[in-house]
Swiss-Prot record:
Coiled coil: none annotated. It comes from Mus musculus. It comes from the Eukaryota. This is Interferon-stimulated gene 20 kDa protein. Its main location: nucleus. One of its GO terms (molecular function) is metal ion binding. Signal peptide: none annotated.
Amino acid sequence: MAGIPEVVAMDCEMVGLGPQRVSGLARCSIVNIHGAVLYDKYIRPEGEITDYRTQVSGVTPQHMVRATPFGEARLEILQLLKGKLVVGHDLKHDFNALKEDMSKYTIYDTSTDRLLWHEAKLQYYSRVSLRLLCKRLLHKNIQVLPGSLLGVGGCILPGTDILHLLLYVGMVRIADLRLLTPFLPPSCLACPLLPESLASARSHAVISALSSSSHLLTPLPNPSQGPQGHVDRLSGQLQDWGGSPLAPALPVSAEQLAGPLLCGRCQGHNGALQNLSATQSPARAALPWDVRLNFILIQG
């Protein structure tokens, strides 16, 4: 699968620094797609620690005795992330703590993926935590004890759960991409306003990389919504789809879709796009649940 970046998941813990208790990096863990730990160190931040946030971070003064200095840890972490696709939840906080420009990296952030929110029936929330997403979608409790980042006390490593979440939504995304891409004009595919679940080559790269690790299919739960067998139907083809040219997964034509399938958010963007109404077409109503879900996201 040439050209597919290596996928890693990163999770950081913070402490409060100075009188304003500004967040500083106190621990960073990185795992690869197979769940192997690539990095896990306590880090001594620059500045005086005024709040260890132990109840949330699990960090204590004892951890700082032999902690790696921030400057040294930062170089180690950034070297590990170089050239990789970084998966995480609310990654802007992690990169801020690393004093690094996040735009230099290829990332996938579960905190901004609205498709995940819809899957978990959390679409009306203004903010969604990783704990809640994992509870709703994976039926797992994470971060239940201080210091549970790497499974202390039987807890699950958040980075691994992020990858499982990514695979869960990725199965829907692959179906969407294969079905919908042939009907989207290049101008729409290139539009930065188009939901990432449809157009992003970055998303497809993540899914393709994940699809090469078949063991990650095992813990995937059946969704409570949608027709029975949805997961089985997709997971059986996931390996074959990885890195393959996109093609319609179902025999659906543009005519059956009652007009061009265009991004409603782009209306007026290039003068050629229209709003999509998923409720006014019998053909659309007959489409699989995973594709109808994406219609909702386009309109949203």
